[in-house]
Regions:
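Terminal amphipathic helices with adjacent charged low-complexity linkers/tails
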Residues: 62, 190-238, 252, 261-264, ...
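Acidic, low-complexity intrinsically disordered tails
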Residues: 376, 594-656
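Flexible glycine/acidic-rich beta-alpha junction loops that bind and position SAM and/or redox cofactors
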Residues: 85-94, 142-144, 174-179, 204-207, ...
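Conserved, mostly hydrophobic/aromatic
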Residues: 166, 272, 307, 332, ...
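N-terminal pre-triad scaffold of radical SAM enzymes
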Residues: 26-31, 288-315, 348
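N-terminal [4Fe-4S]-dependent radical SAM core
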Residues: 1-20, 30, 225-300
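Conserved SAM/AdoMet-binding glycine-rich loop
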Residues: 25, 41, 56, 60-61, ...
Length: 656
């Protein structure tokens, strides 16, 4: 049953009979006691272990005074920027400041600083020099090594160096936080540091058994060295076979990354999600309109963690890992019954999912024994012959969930992997999905159709997507359903040329699809695609990769994906003429744009869009794609939207 909120004021600390908290948890977002928010899970896990935790959410950061609010904690501070990297949260891919922040009271922007982890740590050091500080969450996790920073356009050192924190906890860290807090409680014995899984620390010498990465100085000076470092980091993020890694940060200090924490077992996950969350935003935000991010997940259920899809632009490998773990059927049904008991529940469970909704188990039996394969992906370029493909457990779960009294509909709004679904010869899951669990639109992510671009993205071939579309439409026709597909599309990904963008535009023309918004590739820390963006090399084969960086070319690529919009016609014509594709300029059935902008075309475009939507539902099953903050920061189920789909990163289970 729901409990009470953790204390947020000194008065609430005193009411609990505490002389001081053990830890003060500084977080760069509003306090929402819901298991979709990392600070809520970490706080409840520590509370269940007997620790006294006070929440310091969105502290005023221009001085150290706010960090003295609870006095000096007995053991130390915990710091996280929130479920999304603060720079991703604050800026668009064009480096323009966002106007809203759905993780803040009333959606108000500007309440957290840029590079929140570092700023908070600096203020803590000012307030209490020498006190232990543990940092975690997406921002810390994805910036644990020296990394390319898109906003500074340079290679930055590990955030552990910049923040001067005691330890950096990476990944989904329920067990890691308990191990580290116990280590702090016992006086921080240095000889025990190498035993702490999921932890990074600074050392004067590299451990004898560590793999030595190219140093910060080397990767700053040599992009080939950057690629070698990234590939080692990428390949060793495995809890079973991963090694200790070490990277020299400066003349005197080495960053040491211990092997990743083991994925939580099903029983451990069940215990975490059974903790007494209120599932509400703290009432101190009510007068400001609450916290918008909660509305997206208020009646959603997190079912799985991890993803073996391995898209190049996604940071899941670096944060949650490739080994999927999931909650038990009974745990999920228990949560569904709890949601159905709430007075404001309207009968609709908005999502049952995770990073990928139709993954429920590790890709194969070998993963838990030997780890995920170092040089082979489970689904790309083709599904591995050892991969277990089954939706039986998921179908059983969904049938029982929709039979719960008070539940009218159970939606699946997390993305599904259509290549995994296509590997399942049975139509059972797809049939049930279409009949009972689609809210008029199903999200899928083909991203592109050019073979060259898909290869760099690590996405399945165009033919796989087209076969899925046919299968999806056939099921909908069979049951008389009029349901859309929402394909997410990306422009300007490394490897994508203007020619590739034209190929995608022709595909959209031929399928009568009109994406209203598309996502420009966003280079964020911790992804293979960002490595390609910075170096111009694919670290997997060290081959050169074309990288569109010129803002005008990127605008042309984006315009080609929305070629029907009259506002884009000049850019589209320019791109087509550059490529010698004047055959696509004109009034014929194959033309993308007219020779000149026609009067009143904007009004006609609006009417055609509405008609095309209706037509596409019958002819191709497609609906307009929506924009998104980068998939690289979707670190569990799709995070609450802020101007569209939000990936990476950010979520929401432990390890924050």
């Amino acid at each position: 049953m729901p409990g009470s909120f953790l204390p947020v004021t000194p008065e609430e600390v005193a009411q609990r009979g505490w002389d001081a908290p053990d830890f003060v948890y500084a977080v760069g977002e509003a306090y929402v006691d819901h298991p979709s928010f990392g600070h809520a899970i970490i706080g409840r896990v520590l509370e269940a272990a007997g620790y006294r935790v006070a929440m310091l959410c969105l502290p005023e950061y221009h001085s150290a005074e706010a960090f003295k609010r609870f006095g000096r904690p007995k053991l130390g501070f915990l710091v996280s920027s929130g479920v999304i990297d603060s720079m991703v949260n604050h800026y668009t891919v064009a480096r323009k400041r966002r106007n809203t922040d759905v993780y803040a009271p009333g959606g108000r922007a500007g309440l957290r600083p840029d590079r929140a982890v570092t700023v908070y740590c600096n203020r803590i050091h000012e307030a209490y020099p020498g006190i232990p500080v543990l940092i975690g969450g997406v921002e810390a996790s994805l910036r644990r090594f020296s990394h390319y920073d898109y906003w500074d356009n340079k290679v930055r050192r590990s955030v552990l160096v910049d923040s001067a924190a005691t330890l950096l906890l990476y990944g989904m860290g329920e067990n890691t936080i308990l191990d580290c807090c116990d280590w702090v409680r016992r006086g921080m014995p240095a000889h025990e540091l190498p035993r702490l899984r999921g932890v990074c620390y600074m050392a004067k010498q590299p451990p004898r058994d560590a793999l030595l990465l190219p140093s910060h100085a080397e990767i700053t000076a040599d992009k080939h060295a950057y690629c070698r470092a990234f590939l080692l980091e990428y390949q060793e993020q495995d809890p079973v076979r991963g090694h200790t890694l070490c990277q020299q940060q400066d003349a005197q200090r080495y960053l040491v990354q211990n092997p990743p924490a083991l994925p939580l077992t099903r029983q451990e996950l069940d215990r975490v999600y059974d903790l007494p969350f209120t599932r509400l935003a703290h009432p101190m935000y009510d007068a400001q309109g609450g916290v918008p991010a909660l509305q997206e997940v208020r009646f959603s259920i997190s079912a799985v963690r991890g993803c073996f899809g391995a898209c190049s632009f996604c940071a899941l490998t670096f944060h949650q890992g490739r080994i999927v773990s999931s909650r038990s059927e009974e745990s999920l049904l228990k949560e569904a019954r709890l949601l159905a008991s709430f007075p404001d529940f309207k009968g609709y469970i908005h999502d049952v999912g995770g990073p990928t909704a139709n993954f429920r188990q590790p890709a194969c039996d070998r993963q838990l024994r030997e780890g995920a394969c170092k040089n082979r992906q489970c689904l790309y370029p083709t599904p591995c012959k050892h991969m277990r493909v089954s939706h039986t457990e998921l179908v059983s779960l969904l049938r029982k969930m929709r039979a719960i009294p008070g539940v009218k509909k159970v939606f699946i709004r997390s993305g599904i992997r259509y290549d995994y679904l296509m590997a399942d010869k049975s139509d059972q899951f797809l049939t049930e999905l279409c009949r009972y669990h689609v809210s008029g639109q199903l999200k899928v992510a083909p991203e592109h159709i050019s073979p060259n671009v898909l290869a760099r993205m690590g996405k399945p071939r165009r033919e796989v997507y087209e076969a899925f579309v046919e299968r999806y439409n056939a099921v909908n026709r069979k049951y008389g359903l009029n349901q859309y597909l929402v394909p997410y599309l990306m422009s300007s990904h490394p490897g994508c040329t203007l020619k590739d963008a034209v190929e995608l535009a022709e595909y959209l023309r031929d399928t009568s699809h009109q994406p209203e918004q598309v996502q420009d590739f966003y280079p964020t820390p911790g992804t293979l695609s960002t490595c390609m963006y910075y170096t111009g090399l694919d670290p997997r084969d060290m081959q050169p990769v074309y990288v569109p960086k010129n803002p005008h070319e990127k605008a042309m690529q984006r315009a080609l994906l929305q070629y029907r919009n009259p506002a884009n016609h000049d850019l589209v014509r320019e791109a087509l003429r550059l490529l010698g594709r004047e055959d696509l300029i004109g009034f014929g059935p194959h033309a993308l744009v007219p020779p000149r902008t026609i009067r009143s075309s904007a009004e006609r475009y609006s009417r055609e869009k509405a008609a095309s939507r209706a037509k596409s539902a019958h002819t191709y099953g497609s609906a307009p794609a929506r924009s998104r903050v980068p998939a690289s920061h979707r670190t569990d189920r799709a995070a609450p939207r802020q101007g569209g789909r939000r990936a990476g990163a950010g979520r929401k289970g432990g390890g924050r």
